[in-house]
UniProtKB/Swiss-Prot annotation:
Lineage: Bacteria, Pseudomonadati, Pseudomonadota, Alphaproteobacteria, Maricaulales
Protein name per UniProt: Histidinol-phosphate aminotransferase
Biological source species: Maricaulis maris (strain MCS10) (Caulobacter maris)
CDD domains referenced in this protein's UniProt entry, alphabetically: AAT_like
Quaternary structure (record): Homodimer.
Record flagged with keyword Transferase: yes
Gene3D superfamilies, per the entry: Aspartate Aminotransferase, domain 1 (3.90.1150.10), Type I PLP-dependent aspartate aminotransferase-like (Major domain) (3.40.640.10)
Length: 362
């Protein structure tokens, strides 16, 4: 008889990443994981390759070089930064450090699935606050959060909706939460947002000791394979995360590639410009097919389908897969009538629109 794990662990449904296979089709187009359409910086790739002769050496446990590069690029203090194996690890470390069994965790209705995993791993209770027009609603979050709320997770911008709330609204949220509640701002897609009312939360985290911002190298920097993220916050919070992270949680290749990536502002600029052009194209073209597309500031779009037999999201997903186009079903988020499509290359984006056009006209 197998040894039983801690109560609640077997209730966790493992995270399922975006698929990369279409049965019977060689080299399908993967638009299911919000990966960078331009790949990664050549400088980052070269920096990673240069570590090949040093694989017998342990990396710097504090990722000092990387933290200093992030600090210089972003105008931050290196001692207020901690790095992790993707921002996913940092979110899990926050749960490990701050959540007790029975604590309340609050997220927005369509929040990133990892928040639920973090809560369940720690035996905490997750409450989802209703959204308004697929956008986080500060009033609803405040209503859901009481004195017993330990963490509020806010993805801003949010995945899978692609929407955001303004810096003023984020500040209003923090001001309305209990002092004992930690506000975690997941800004994985921050670099794609160019709207003047948006801010990733860095200024708020700099001012307060109850806010932390998580970031990733997987999106704008295109380093998803290396699993690299970072967080910025008050020294007391960062110190706690250093105490619960692994001693060598970020590998040498990630440190070197991340350092080169954060310094390659030209690649970041090209990534943003590509995304701005093609996210607008997808919204306009797919909207022209009679499908609703949620306005997105990220490198993906959320497409809504009717419940008409033969034209549902599930039908569209099956058809697109048969054409070698893999996008993401989002029913685990409570969005059974929608699909999420990553912004790809020009060829991939046009191919997606053509396939959806054929599907809708059939």
């Amino acid at each position: 008889m197998a040894i039983e794990p801690r109560a609640g662990i077997l209730d966790i449904r493992p995270y399922k990443p975006g698929s990369s296979e279409a049965p019977g089709i060689e080299n399908p187009v993967k638009l299911s994981s919000n990966e960078n359409a331009l790949g990664c910086s050549d400088k980052a790739a070269a920096a990673m390759t240069a570590t090949a002769s040093k694989l017998h050496l342990y990396p710097d446990g504090g990722a000092t070089k990387l933290r200093e590069a992030i600090a210089e690029a972003e105008g931050l203090e290196a001692e207020n930064i901690v790095c992790g194996t993707g921002s996913d690890e940092l979110l899990q470390l926050l749960g490990r450090a701050y959540l007790n069994p029975g604590d309340k965790v609050v997220q927005s209705q369509y929040g990133f699935l990892v928040y639920r995993l973090v809560a369940m791993q720690c035996g905490a209770n997750l409450v989802s606050a209703p959204e308004r027009d697929y956008r986080s609603d500060v009033d609803a979050i405040l209503e859901a959060a009481g004195d017993d709320t330990r963490i509020v997770f806010l993805a801003n911008p949010n995945n899978p909706t692609g929407t955001y709330i303004s810096a003023a609204e984020v500040r209003r949220l923090r001001d309305g939460l209990p002092a004992s509640t930690l506000l975690v701002l997941d800004a994985a897609y921050a670099e794609f947002v160019d709207n003047p009312d948006y801010e990733a939360g860095i200024e708020l985290a700099r001012e307060r000791d109850d806010v932390i911002v998580t970031r990733t190298f997987s999106k704008i920097h295109g380093l998803a394979a290396l699993r690299l993220g970072w967080a910025y916050g008050n020294k007391a919070i960062i110190d706690v995360l250093h105490r619960v992270r692994g001693p060598f949680n970020v590998n040498m290749a990630a440190i070197e590639a991340g350092t080169a990536a954060i310094q390659d502002r030209d690649f970041m600029k090209r990534s943003v410009e590509h995304n701005e052009e093609w996210v607008a194209f997808l919204r306009q073209q797919i909207g022209g097919l009679g499908l609703e597309v949620t306005p997105s500031v990220c490198n993906f779009v959320l497409i809504h389908f009717p419940e008409t037999p033969g034209k549902t999201a599930a039908d569209a997903d099956a058809y697109l897969t048969s054409q070698g186009l893999i996008i993401r079903a989002v029913d685990p988020y409570g969005l059974p009538n929608a699909l999420r499509a990553t912004v790809g290359s020009e060829t991939e984006n046009r191919r997606l629109v053509d396939a959806l056009s054929t599907f809708m006209k059939a």
